[in-house]
Amino acid sequence: MKALLALGFLASWVAAGEHALRGECPADPLPCQELCTGDESCPQGHKCCSTGCGHACRGDIEGGRDGQCPRILVGLCIVQCMMDENCQSGERCCKSGCGRFCIPGLQPLQQLKDSNLTDGFNSKLEAQAP
């Protein structure tokens, strides 16, 4: 029975090896590291947060595009981009714990002044003014 089990394992290992590519996998661009020791060790406006396997400063990526990164992808260690330029137009490369994702940037409320809701509200205020 053990020999049959070992033979089955060996056959599956050989079959899996047939699909493997040559070469080595690249190093993880964001390995688990202690990149900060507290909020005071981070740039202004950033916090020292757990990545699940270390700590890193979290906040906007300096020098990036307009808009803020939403905080919905925490805990996923997938690196889809390294900087905003790796993303499509209108998207930001946002940190998420130990990963980075391309997602549309959130605009601050002041920048939403062209929306229909704001225009309608301003029209009502102007009509009520003496």
Curated annotation (Swiss-Prot):
Q: Where in the cell is it found?
A: Secreted
Query: Which residue ranges does UniProt annotate as crossing the membrane?
Result: none
Which InterPro entries does its entry note? Elafin-like_sf, WAP_dom, WAP_four-disulfide_core
User: What's the protein called, per UniProt?
Assistant: WAP four-disulfide core domain protein 3
Q: Report which gene this protein is encoded by.
A: Wfdc3
| Glycosylation (residues) | N116
What is the top-level taxon of the source organism? Answer: Eukaryota
From the UniProt record, which GO molecular function terms apply? serine-type endopeptidase inhibitor activity
What organism is listed for this UniProt entry? Mus musculus
- Classify the main location: secreted
Output the Gene Ontology cellular-component terms.
Answer: extracellular region
Alphabetized UniProt keyword annotations: Disulfide bond, Glycoprotein, Protease inhibitor, Repeat, Secreted, Serine protease inhibitor, Signal
Pfam families documented for this protein: WAP (PF00095)
Tell whether Signal is among the UniProt keywords: yes
Signal peptide start and end residues: 1-16
Which cysteines form disulfides? C25-C49, C32-C53, C36-C48, C42-C57, C69-C94, C77-C98, C81-C93, C87-C102
Domain (WAP): residue spans on this chain: 17-61, 62-106
